[in-house]
Amino acid sequence: MPKLILASTSPWRRALLEKLQISFECAAPEVDETPRSDESPRQLVLRLAQEKAQSLASRYPDHLIIGSDQVCVLDGEITGKPLTEENARLQLRKASGNIVTFYTGLALFNSANGHLQTEVEPFDVHFRHLCEAEIDNYVRKEHPLHCAGSFKSEGFGITLFERLEGRDPNTLVGLPLIALCQMLRREGKNPLMG
C-alpha cells in the first residue's frame, strides 16, 4: 500500500488531515504560484493543486501525494492575504453584506502509476453587514493577517457570518476531506480501514 504525503507545510492542512487518523508525512512542494493572466480562480487552484502533488513525485516515487490550493474570490477578484491590519479592515469592509467564495483545488497523485485525480470544491461565506467597530475589534482580536479574506472561520471569524454554504466545512480551512476520502478509496486506501 503506498504511503501518503501531504504536499504542504500548512499547519491547518496538517491538522485537517490528522482528523482521518491515517499515517502521513508532510513535504514542501516547489511550485511557482503566480496566476496566469488567462486563468479563472477554478483553473488556478486546480493547476496549483496538481503541480504541488506532482512536484514531489521524484522524491516520493511510490506514494499517494496530496496537493491542495485555495483562493478567496469577492466580486470576481481573487482576494489574497492582507498582511497588514489596514488591508484586513479593507477586505472585511468589502466582504460586509456580501458573499465570498472560496475555491479549493485538490489533487491526489499516485506516483507509482501516474494516476491523477483532481477536483475543485467551492464554498460560499455569507457575511453579515458589519459596522466599523466590529471590523476593528475583529482584526484586533484575531490578527487575520495571513488568512485569505482576512478571517479565520475556525476561530473568532465565525462571528462575522450569516451562513456558510458548501459540501464540506473542511474545505473552508483548506483541505476538502470528503472529496479526499473518495479519492483515497478509489486508490484502495480506505481511511476507515486503517
From Swiss-Prot:
Gene Ontology CC entries for this record: cytoplasm
Stretch forming the signal peptide: none
Site, Important for substrate specificity: residue positions: 12, 70, 154
Active site: 69
Matching InterPro entries: ITPase-like_fam, Maf-like
Role, per record: Nucleoside triphosphate pyrophosphatase that hydrolyzes 7-methyl-GTP (m(7)GTP). May have a dual role in cell division arrest and in preventing the incorporation of modified nucleotides into cellular nucleic acids.
A Pfam cross-reference name: Maf
Assigned keywords, A-Z: Cytoplasm, Hydrolase, Nucleotide metabolism
Cellular location(s): Cytoplasm
Stated family: Belongs to the Maf family. YceF subfamily.
Parts forming coiled coils: none
HAMAP family membership: Maf
Main location: cytoplasm
GO biological process: nucleotide metabolic process
Source organism: Shigella boydii serotype 4 (strain Sb227)
Requisite cofactors: a divalent metal cation
Enzyme class: hydrolase
Catalytic reaction equation(s): N(7)-methyl-GTP + H2O = N(7)-methyl-GMP + diphosphate + H(+)
Name of the protein this chain belongs to: 7-methyl-GTP pyrophosphatase
